[in-house]
UniProtKB/Swiss-Prot annotation:
GO MF annotations, alphabetized: ion channel inhibitor activity; toxin activity
Species of provenance: Cupiennius salei
Domain of life from the UniProt record: Eukaryota
Domain comment in the entry: The presence of a 'disulfide through disulfide knot' structurally defines this protein as a knottin.
A GO-annotated cellular component: extracellular region
The protein's name in its UniProt record: Toxin CSTX-18
Primary residence: secreted
Localization (cell): Secreted
Disulfide bond sites: C9-C22, C14-C27, C21-C36, C29-C34
Length: 51
């Protein structure tokens, strides 16, 4: 799945204009289903992307 930070979720689906998912924590979105990820893991993932 892809790491999407600040994803919007509505009833477990990723939608624009929906409720902000996970209180600003990173989300993993797969098949329009959002999963919340711990902040630490999200930061590590982001660091790996920018390296």
């Amino acid at each position: 799945g892809l790491w999407i930070k600040g994803n919007y979720c509505l009833r477990g689906r990723c939608l624009p204009g929906g409720r902000k998912c996970c209180n600003g924590r990173p989300c993993e979105c797969f098949a329009k289903i959002c999963s919340c990820k711990p902040k630490l893991i999200g930061k590590l993932s982001a660091l790996k992307k920018h390296t």
